Amino acid sequence: MSEATPAIAVDGLYKRFGIVEAVAGIDFTVAAGSTTALLGGNGAGKTTTLSILLGLLVPTAGQVRVFGEDMVRHRHRVLPGMNFSSPYVDLPRRLTVIENLTVYGHLYGLSDVSDRIRHLARDLDIEAFLRRPTGDLSSGQRTRVALAKALLNEPRLLLLDEPTASLDPDTADWVRGYLESYQRESGATLLLASHNMGEVERLCDQVLMMRRGAIVDRGKPADLIDRYGRETLEQVFLDIARSGDGAGGAPNTDTGATP
């Protein structure tokens, strides 16, 4: 992969479930080493897009390339460099935290599972409950464990679905700070699905505004705010949600996010 090859390149992507068009012909790129958000309300197509990127769903039409590899044809070559974190994906609740992480470490083919768990336990402040059943943890603790699971294989691409959903403000702020530091220090590429405007403004180089399966506008958070003449990304989001279109009635096609 050359330095110019994007981490993600999506071209003409469609996904239909019967007569429902969940993803409606979207195109976007994500630069390697950047952080991008899929921003939209419920039913916008964010999670479906992530599921296609993870190889969990096959697109109806279109192409998805991850690090230059076709995701549909060569997912076995792509997946080892990726991982996924979501508060909605439950780890086996009867297993202890360390048992869960050990199982996943072996599934990822790691040779140094114990060392990697110790490192992440320290970084994510989960050492105190490594030997507790995962089902006994608070939502904030489970979110940290889910992140540890997702980072075990040191992914080049980390996909996150609503990473701070249902967290109290203090824990949510800690998670955002950790993701910010992790991306900066590791150089990994992050793609997150969210409808938390403050989170997106803080973390992201590029925002893809989604509505009813389509990308209706895109750009850096500050550029979107300026383009719509607003003070916050939340106000931009509400403008788009109420109008059903992007600024000036047409999407901005500039896809260049810089790290």
Where are these regions (language model features)?
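Catalytic Walker B motif of ABC-type/P-loop ATPase nucleotide-binding domains
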Residues: 158-162
